[in-house]
Amino acid sequence: MSLAGGRAPRKTAGNRLSGLLEAEEEDEFYQTTYGGFTEESGDDEYQGDQSDTEDEVDSDFDIDEGDEPSSDGEAEEPRRKRRVVTKAYKEPLKSLRPRKVSTPAGSSQKAREEKALLPLELQDDGSDSRKSMRQSTAEHTRQTFLRVQERQGQSRRRKGPHCERPLTQEELLREAKITEELNLRSLETYERLEADKKKQVHKKRKCPGPIITYHSVTVPLVGEPGPKEENVDIEGLDPAPSASALTPHAGTGPVNPPARCSRTFITFSDDATFEEWFPQGRPPKVPVREVCPVTHRPALYRDPVTDIPYATARAFKIIREAYKKYITAHGLPPTASALGPGPPPPEPLPGSGPRALRQKIVIK
């Protein structure tokens, strides 16, 4: 439940409403437009024979669709007189012009003088404004405005006219001397600061730790040297042209600049950094170059029976003949005799490769 509905009504409620309604002036727009809306006596032009309360229905609505005449030649019946329609009513607009109030000449002159003394916020143009300002507040504001005006007038009288006296030659010289001293002090301070800056030598900052430098340049292109040409003196041929004849004469044609190529260099500050980025693995074992015992040449093959390297077919035949003589003189090994004729089986040797399992025979 709202507070307005539950509280008791005021005793003075609605006292000013009647005064506002009486003070409301009529707008001239509705008195002149469309001939005015005021009621005039003897205006019977828009009064009909029948009352406006009765609802009149057109004759066309009384006829049913089935009862319409089939021919159009019949005379149309006169329609009944319709009700007169008047213009719609609009809400009157409030007038913006101030209401003229008849006041005596003496009181209006006095009010105009008091109005000129007040500030713009408190000036009343005589219209019926709806400002709700208490009389005591308006009086205090007026007194404050008068005090401010009086204080401003006293300050103007105290200051008087403002005029500057031209300085004499002695006063100008004294001011110039003071300015010169200030300039000398400023110059000395500036020179001292410049000297301090020169003393502080800018040292190149060195970066601690390893450094990798990347440098890319262009260099002239150097081709690979070709086969050296030998001068051969053959009778009946023309002599070789001289060097002066081979060189082109100046101005005979455009000289092409030498070709250039780019080269990039990466420099490491120490070896540890280089090894960190480019680690070197263990060097591969270089295989031992075996020599043929017959021809003393690099061996290309190996005998599967005697495990002796050889280079040529003749060396292979010599190795086999020596092997047969060895078997004839010393006989086969125990394992070979048990297995019968044929190539001897390999001897098992612990910790040896597949080549070490073969039977080795040294030929002297």
Swiss-Prot record:
This is Vacuolar protein sorting-associated protein 72 homolog. Its main location: nucleus. SMART domains: YL1_C. The modification Phosphoserine is found at S127, S129. Keywords: Chromatin regulator, DNA-binding, Isopeptide bond, Nucleus, Phosphoprotein, Transcription, Transcription regulation, Ubl conjugation. One of its GO terms (biological process) is positive regulation of double-strand break repair via homologous recombination. There is a cross-link at K115 (Glycyl lysine isopeptide (Lys-Gly) (interchain with G-Cter in SUMO2)). One of its GO terms (molecular function) is histone binding. Residues 127-142 have a biased composition (Basic and acidic residues). Residues 1-164, 233-258, 335-357 are annotated as: Disordered.
